[in-house]
A protein has these predicted regions:
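Local sequence-structure signature of Cys/Sec-based thiol-disulfide redox active-site neighborhoods
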Residues: 1-27
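Conserved residues at beta->alpha junctions
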Residues: 9, 34, 60
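Short alpha-helical
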Residues: 13, 38, 64
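Thiol-based oxidoreductase modules, predominantly thioredoxin-like and allied folds used
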Residues: 28-40
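Short amphipathic alpha-helix with an adjacent loop that forms part of the alpha/beta core around
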Residues: 41-47, 73-76
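Structural micro-motif
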Residues: 47-57, 66-67
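Non-catalytic, surface beta->alpha helical segment in thiol-disulfide oxidoreductase systems
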Residues: 58-77
């Protein structure tokens, strides 16, 4: 089973789509919300240079955003 950690922010449609995709693919999902679960400074330390949401970790690897998650989960055998 894949483990997905999604760093999200309020009112982020792509964040919600990433969560829905991961759940549909039966992944274990940790959905973290900025301001509740982490601070912006913590995000910048974890993902230097990140400018978009969501930021996603798949099985311990920083993969980027929704497009990367979609590609990786869709290409699984």
């Amino acid at each position: 089973m894949n483990k997905v950690i999604i760093y999200s922010k309020p009112s982020c449609p792509a964040c919600k789509r990433a969560k829905m995709l991961a759940e549909t693919r039966k992944c274990e999902v940790d959905y973290l919300m900025m301001g509740e679960d982490f601070k912006p400074k913590e995000l910048m330390e974890q993902f230097p240079g990140a400018r978009t949401f969501p930021q996603i970790i798949l099985n311990g690897e920083k993969i980027g955003g929704l497009a990367a998650l979609t590609e990786m989960l869709t290409n699984e055998v």
